[in-house]
């Protein structure tokens, strides 16, 4: 493979990693926030507990997007095949 081909493949791989890798967390976070808002609307006195649990869950969901970003950065800037 030529260096140009490897560079193009790295750019496309990074774009797919960030593009597709952010869809899951975005949908998951949207559903989690919607469910938390619905639960708080039903039981306002439990808002503190629900908010705390929501933030922990959102942090766990967001790790997938962060991992995809790290993979994309590795493909772009630390790719061992680019020479």
From Swiss-Prot:
Record carries keyword Transmembrane helix: yes
GO terms for cellular component: plasma membrane; proton-transporting ATP synthase complex; proton-transporting two-sector ATPase complex, proton-transporting domain
Listed InterPro entries: ATP_synth_csu_bac/chlpt, ATP_synth_F0_csu, ATP_synth_F0_csu_DDCD_BS, ATP_synth_F0_csu_sf, ATPase_proteolipid_c-like_dom, F/V-ATP_Csub_sf
The entry's keywords: ATP synthesis, Cell inner membrane, Cell membrane, CF(0), Hydrogen ion transport, Ion transport, Lipid-binding, Membrane, Plasmid, Transmembrane, Transmembrane helix, Transport
Localization, UniProt: Cell inner membrane
The protein's role, per its UniProt record: F(1)F(0) ATP synthase produces ATP from ADP in the presence of a proton or sodium gradient. F-type ATPases consist of two structural domains, F(1) containing the extramembraneous catalytic core and F(0) containing the membrane proton channel, linked together by a central stalk and a peripheral stalk. During catalysis, ATP synthesis in the catalytic domain of F(1) is coupled via a rotary mechanism of the central stalk subunits to proton translocation. Key component of the F(0) channel; it plays a direct role in translocation across the membrane. A homomeric c-ring of between 10-14 subunits forms the central stalk rotor element with the F(1) delta and epsilon subunits.
Name assigned to this protein: ATP synthase subunit c 2
Upper lineage: Bacteria, Pseudomonadati, Pseudomonadota, Alphaproteobacteria, Rhodobacterales
């Amino acid at each position: 493979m030529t260096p140009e081909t490897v560079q193009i493949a790295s750019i496309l791989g990074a774009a797919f990693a960030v593009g597709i890798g952010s869809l899951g967390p975005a949908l998951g976070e949207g559903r989690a926030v919607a469910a938390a808002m619905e639960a708080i609307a039903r039981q306002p006195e439990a808002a503190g507990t629900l908010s705390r649990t929501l933030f922990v869950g959102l942090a766990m969901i967001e790790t997938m997007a962060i991992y995809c970003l790290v993979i994309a950065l590795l493909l772009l800037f630390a790719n061992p095949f680019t020479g």
